[in-house]
Amino acid sequence: MPGERATGESPGEGSVLPLRRPPIRRSTTVRSDLDHVFTTFVRTIGVWWPLQPMSIGGDRARTVTIDEYTGGRVYETWDDGTTAEWGRLAVWEPPNRFVMSWLNTPAPTEVELAFTALGPTLTRVSVEHRGWEHLTEDQLREDCAAPGGYSSGAYSGGWAAALAASVAAIESTLP
């Protein structure tokens, strides 16, 4: 298969190495303390997540839920009560980070959200979406609701929009 070589074969003249597909990395800052940012991000994701167009159920999607424990589900709920799983929490370390499988791609990828205190009332929220090397070129173009998928930057733009929505929601809950 193009881009692959047999196990133990060393790269040499004429060999083809697999393309490296870099992770998507986005970050933002929130004017609030670490605990508030993490808790509000997780517990109100169903309020601020941009379900249109970033959901499995489209117009049927009503909310998003994160089960707050290792092994917990991240899922959306539709207007008829049906749930569609986005992934499972592989790491749960409040208030610093969580890592989840991402099942909304043809082959699972992984998303890490990290929360870092930059000061008493300033927190950085960073996302790294990785594992793109598991997808074919066609899957990379067709893997998300936005036209072009990974290959055209749709996921990068989607994560930027999600982070911006989270900042607005979190900062609106400040006293």
Label each residue range with its predicted role.
Residues 58, 62, 164-175:
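Short, highly charged C-terminal tails/helix-capping segments
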Residues 23-29, 73, 84, 97, ...:
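Intrinsic-disorder/low-complexity, polar/charged segments enriched in Ser/Thr/Lys/Arg/Asp/Glu/Gln
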Residues 26-28, 64, 87-90, 110-117:
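Hydrophobic/aromatic beta-strand elements that line small-molecule binding cavities or substrate pockets
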